[in-house]
Regions:
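Glycine-rich loop-to-alpha-helix module at the N-terminal edge of alpha/beta enzyme cores
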Residues: 32-119, 130
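Residue-level signature of catalytic and energy-coupling elements of molecular machines
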Residues: 10, 29, 65, 109, ...
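Conserved strand-loop elements at the edges of beta-sheets that form or border functional pockets
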Residues: 25, 37, 137
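Short glycine/serine/threonine-biased micro-segments
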Residues: 8, 13, 90, 119, ...
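Hydrophobic face of amphipathic alpha-helices that form TPR/SEL1-like repeat modules
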Residues: 1-27, 34
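Short capping/connector residues at structural and topological boundaries
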Residues: 12-13, 17-18, 100, 124, ...
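Conserved small-residue-rich beta-alpha loop and adjacent elements
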Residues: 122-143
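Gly/Ser/Thr-rich helix-start
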Residues: 11, 93, 115, 122, ...
Length: 143
């Protein structure tokens, strides 16, 4: 039986809990894998690592971030058939519907590739009667 472990800090890790959950194919009802369940310490560790990654990412210049997103886009396109098959197995969708879901997700990544020019913030005068609009880039952090 396939075991799905945790993916934290760019690595597959088993976690400290020995508890597992069953993963079913929703179209067939058959069990297709088991997933390792996280303990509270596994969760806290993952959140701390995500906070550190956020700090590193937030100081990275927008052009470097765009390069990462373009590489992500390239990987999605290169592996689209395999990813579509995973969506079929995980969500019970027919292939064409799963392909559409992947395409919609890819569109979000494509939008993110072009977003660096929007990160600058802006000021617009008189967007309404005696109303000016000002925006600034302010990362939210780990949510």
């Amino acid at each position: 039986m396939k075991i799905i472990e945790h993916f934290v800090d760019g690595k597959i890790v088993p976690g400290s809990s020995k508890k597992k959950g069953k993963v079913f194919n929703p179209a067939t009802g058959e069990q297709q894998a088991e997933v390792m369940l996280a303990s509270s310490s596994d969760l806290n560790n993952a959140v701390e690592i995500a906070k550190k990654a956020f700090n590193d990412w937030s100081i990275r210049p927008p052009l470097q971030r765009a390069r990462v997103m373009f590489k992500f886009k390239e990987l999605i396109e290169k592996n689209s058939d395999e990813l579509t098959k995973m969506i079929v197995a995980e969500h019970g969708k027919v292939y064409e519907d799963a392909k559409g879901s992947l395409t919609r997700g890819l569109e979000v990544v494509e939008f993110a590739c072009g977003i660096p020019h929007l990160l600058k913030g802006e000021f617009s005068e008189n967007v309404g009667t005696n109303v000016d609009s000002w925006s600034m880039r302010q990362p939210l952090g780990v949510v």
